């Protein structure tokens, strides 16, 4: 039976791969990963590596995820492996129902529409109509390779142009509304493009699938940024901008760093900080913290040094406190002088931001400093009280 990809994604995310594999073989830490002697071929020198979401043997080529490991190591069928892991994760394997099949059909169709829209936006960016948007991105210091890597595009002027273009491929207006690309006004009876006169930023899930968009207006209009609405494939609370690229970067040794905006993420990746991600126009959520900890045991939160950025840092720190454990913590880094990561890199280059990361503080120290600054009182008694609260 075919299982919904969303269920399989959640099962893989909830399954601690190193713990599953560690039951059958001895593993040792190797940087951010684990390694051991491959269970699938005889070897004396470890060449079997376990990452957050897959294993790979550089000796025999064995490769797979948690489901694949159970199948290969136990000779289990696919469904047997899924049922075993789901039971351990406290998940129910979905039964084949007409409703489940319809929900999966909807998700598939939304994915197709979003992918087609991304391609259309990218084409427009490199047509004459997208010249101003392209110049804007280049003037912000982005290279053409970076623009293409992140799939940046140009919405066009709206007026139904997207529906007209995608309609040629059989994508109907109703599907574009469901995908968060158009909106219907019941008062006027008109359906309009959600994004127009905006630079487009595809939002991708952790597996690299386009699930929504953010759009930045050209010029000084408001709102500066618009994000797509909640849909069957997109949740602002659960997803992180840049997570697909950051997962690979962190796997290769990059620091996982959380910044505030799309351009911050892109500028950091271009400068070589391949673990950069950002929340999607909202304060950091518990779901996003969980996603961060799936990638790294100690992400660095790096918010702007202005009052709004410091409030965001304090809220994120407060949210994380009940969730901390020996293998799940945070660091906080602050950019002084009113800069953000994007502007800091343009002024000082890679070294400027590296200095910020190097100065990142463990959560307790950083939160203590935030509380001290907020209080305006620096007496020894108050400092001791703050420290006691943080260590409770």
Predicted segments, located by residue:
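C-terminal or mid-to-C-terminal helical accessory/interaction module adjacent to the motor/catalytic core
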Residues: 327-392
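Conserved active-site segments centered on acidic
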Residues: 80-135
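Acidic beta-strand-to-loop metal/phosphate-binding motif
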Residues: 67, 256-258, 297-308, 313, ...
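Arginine/glycine-rich "motif VI" loop of SF2 helicases in the C-terminal RecA-like domain
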Residues: 319-327
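N-terminal structured subdomain of primase-like DNA metabolism proteins
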Residues: 1-101, 157, 163
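Phosphate-handling DNA/RNA-contact segment within nucleic-acid enzymes
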Residues: 30, 102-117, 130, 156-295, ...
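Amphipathic alpha-helical transducer elements in NTP-driven molecular machines
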Residues: 14, 18, 75-82, 107-114, ...
């Amino acid at each position: 039976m075919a299982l919904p990809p969303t269920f399989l994604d959640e099962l893989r995310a909830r399954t601690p791969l190193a713990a599953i594999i560690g039951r059958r073989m001895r593993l040792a830490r190797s940087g951010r990963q684990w390694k051991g002697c491959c269970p699938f071929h005889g070897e004396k020198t470890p060449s079997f590596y376990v990452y957050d979401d897959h294993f790979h043997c550089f000796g025999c080529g064995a490769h797979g995820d948690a489901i694949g490991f159970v199948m290969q190591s136990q000779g289990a069928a696919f469904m047997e492996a899924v049922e075993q892991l789901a039971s351990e994760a406290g998940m129910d394997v979905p039964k084949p129902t007409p409703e489940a099949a319809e929900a999966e059909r909807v998700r598939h169709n939304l994915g197709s529409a979003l992918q087609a829209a991304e391609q259309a936006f990218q084409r427009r960016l490199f047509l004459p109509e997208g010249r101003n948007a392209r110049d804007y991105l280049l003037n912000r210091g982005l290279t053409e390779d970076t623009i293409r890597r992140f799939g940046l595009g140009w919405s066009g002027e709206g007026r139904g142009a997207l529906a007209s273009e995608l309609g040629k491929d059989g994508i109907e207006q109703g599907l574009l509304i469901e995908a968060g690309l158009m909106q219907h006004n019941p008062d006027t009876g008109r359906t309009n493009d959600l994004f127009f006169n905006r630079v487009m930023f595809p939002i991708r899930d952790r597996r690299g699938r386009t699930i929504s968009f953010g759009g930045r207006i050209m010029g000084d209009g408001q709102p500066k940024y618009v994000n797509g609405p909640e849909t069957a494939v997109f949740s602002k609370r659960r997803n992180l901008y840049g997570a697909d690229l950051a997962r690979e970067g962190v796997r290769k040794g990059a620091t996982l760093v959380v910044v505030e905006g799309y351009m911050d993420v892109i500028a950091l990746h271009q400068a070589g900080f391949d673990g950069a991600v950002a929340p999607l126009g909202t304060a950091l959520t518990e779901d996003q913290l969980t996603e961060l900890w799936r990638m790294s045991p100690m992400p660095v939160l790096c918010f702007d040094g202005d009052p709004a950025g410091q409030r965001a840092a304090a809220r994120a720190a407060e949210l994380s406190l009940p969730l901390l454990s020996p293998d799940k913590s945070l660091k906080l880094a602050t950019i002084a002088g009113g800069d953000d990561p994007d502007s800091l890199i343009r002024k000082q280059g890679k070294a400027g931001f590296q200095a910020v990361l190097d100065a990142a503080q463990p959560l307790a120290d950083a939160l203590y400093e935030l509380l001290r600054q907020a209080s305006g009182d620096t007496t020894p008694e108050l400092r001791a009280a703050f420290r006691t609260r943080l260590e409770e």
